Amino acid sequence: MRIVIDGMGGDKAPEEIIKGAVSALDSYEDIELIITGIEKHLNRELNKYNFPEDRVKIIPASEIISMNESPSKALRKKKDSSIVKGINLVKEDKATAFISAGNTGAVMAGGLFLLGRLPSIKRPAIATVFPSRNGGTLVIDAGANVDSKPENLNQFAIMGQIYSKHVLGVKNPRVGLLSIGEEQAKGNQLTKGAFSLLDEDKRIINFVGNVEGRDIFNGSCDVVVCDGFVGNVVLKTTEGAASYIFDLIKDTFNKNILTKLSGLMIKPFLKKQMALVDYRQYGGAPLLGVNGVVIISHGSSNSTAIKNAIKVAKETVNKNVVGLIKQEINKDGE
């Protein structure tokens, strides 16, 4: 399996990208990596490690799409960027998946315009795993579409159900629609319209109705469906809240010598619990609905996140998620 990585994408590129890539080579013997980016910078980092050189190839890219660039303009103007060259390798069947911690909008636009949508898919969506009591809840869409229609949410549910079942290993995923109350009458025009479609669609086997924001974390459902505007707000709010809580805990244990000693005693336990809500453990989020495997990683990804993103890409390819979505979306939901 050949996976291509954007070597210049993210706040910690290329150092952490290369470190994570080399670590993945040790863990997954069935993968080969193509790394796109500025050759001298990539080679400088690769020279720090021992690795099987026959399993790594650099594809030079002279341009970088920065985080604050307009995605559409950057794609048009920067044809020799690490993102464009990487996605084109998937398009040309020279790689099976693409991973980037770079400009999310550019990666989404590249996936959509270079790879294209799957037949019958109206909008692609980002599927992000949130920590929960049952191990993880998939939220879809987490930011690809700020405006959606009920039929879009219906398709998001089908794609999320497939990913949850085949990649996350949930036997019979419970699908919930994010709203402001559990009752069917609650919500806005979008959620009310989506509820009717989800409730009637036989392709969605286990629709549990409306769910609230707290249900993402309490384990009462496995897939939470929403539009990308709401999903991204939930994502950023969760990240901010987690960071704030960690800071509060730190401040509490740093107050005096007694609290510091208490902190040292429970540090191993806290470390273990904090790892459960660390985005790095989840690696990256697939852009579902495009004609290829595209994994979007957090802009602050370190080597652990990149290694886990490679794992996500590998499993998404192995489970034939793209093929399953193509097959399921064309079935009659009546």
UniProtKB/Swiss-Prot annotation:
Subcellular location as annotated: Cytoplasm
Keyword Transferase: yes
Chemical reaction(s) catalysed: a fatty acyl-[ACP] + phosphate = an acyl phosphate + holo-[ACP]
Known pathway: Lipid metabolism; phospholipid metabolism
Presence of the UniProt keyword ATP-binding in the record: no
Gene Ontology annotations for the cellular component aspect, listed alphabetically: cytoplasm
One Pfam family here: FA_synthesis
Broadest EC class assigned to this enzyme: transferase
Protein family according to the UniProt entry: Belongs to the PlsX family.
NCBIfam families: plsX
Annotated function: Catalyzes the reversible formation of acyl-phosphate (acyl-PO(4)) from acyl-[acyl-carrier-protein] (acyl-ACP). This enzyme utilizes acyl-ACP as fatty acyl donor, but not acyl-CoA.
Protein name, per record: Phosphate acyltransferase
Species assigned in the record: Halothermothrix orenii (strain H 168 / OCM 544 / DSM 9562)
